[in-house]
Amino acid sequence: MASYILRRILVTIPVMAIVALFVFSLLYIAPGDPAAVIAGDQASPADVERIRQSLGLDRPFLVQFGTWLWRILHFDLGNSIFTNLPVTSMIVQRIEPTLSLMLLTLVLTLVVAVPLGVVAAWKAGSLIDRAIMAFAVSAFSLPVFVVGYVLAYVFALELEWAPVQGYTPIAEGFWPWLQSLILPSIALGCVHIALIARITRASMLEVLQQDYIRTGRAKGLGQRSILFVHALKNAAVPIVTVIGIGVALLIGGAVVTESVFAIPGLGRLTVDAILRRDYPVIQGVVLMFSFLYTLVNLLVDLTYTIIDPRIRY
């Protein structure tokens, strides 16, 4: 196991290097000149050129990339073009709402989706199964922002059960924190609940047809023990795989959700940076999300060996 973990970490190094190259290339792929954006519309060509030199944009591409990568290795993501604040500190200030939203959404998804998928497989072909699958198809088809606006209107504006917008840090209390995130988590989690419920149902149906399940039933094992102890454990590998892939969807969905509910997280920071063409901030956030997704994939691979002892590396 230790050798496998070491190999996986070594594999992530070239992956992150390629990601870093792509992120840095955004400066050249994106339209517009960062120096001209900083200088403003009234600046002369000489002013723009002076800013280019101060930013090092007049140097060769590989030299700029090497300098930028060296700073990254020292946790220096540069400064924002507009606020002149360190990008690292901006990310640290905004990361709590985003991670809180993603973690709460993930917990909500697992608590709801896995039991729904298990029940749908247990009652395959019944009215309950069809109702769950109809809900899954409907939830999967709805955009995050549509669900968000509907939830905000019904439960925040009309019923006043939760705040419409904003975020309350968990340091100010668990209940206010939960109230500020419950509607965004439901809006963001609908697609993931639908996806994981369908995958759980399909995986459980395959496992429930195996001989050892029939043997357990013949020996008098209870239905709950068969479903949640024996069948679910052996059906968990595809579910964990989809959960790992779903982290990328969570990252993308968090950007939209934070915009709908005015949550001051990394999603809002990214949108504001894109609108202002604040390239250092965009690069820093994308690089951080890429590292997070790579780490999640590593954890998913390690989880395989825990839930299925037959998998060895």
Predicted regions and their residues:
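Alpha-helical transmembrane segments of integral membrane proteins
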Residues: 2-4, 92-129, 144, 157, ...
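Short hydrophobic helices that act as membrane-entry/anchoring signals
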Residues: 3, 7, 63, 67-71, ...
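N-terminal signal-anchor/signal peptide hydrophobic helix marking the start
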Residues: 6-16
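Residue-level recognition of pore/gate-forming positions within transmembrane alpha-helices
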Residues: 12, 20, 42, 110, ...
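Hydrophobic alpha-helical transmembrane segments of membrane transport/permease proteins
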Residues: 15-66, 159-180
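Hydrophobic alpha-helical transmembrane segments of multi-pass integral membrane proteins
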Residues: 17-22, 103-107, 150-151, 287
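Membrane-water interface segments at the C-terminal ends of transmembrane alpha-helices
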Residues: 22-29, 59, 67-70, 134-165, ...
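An internal, D/E-rich "acidic patch" concept
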Residues: 58-114
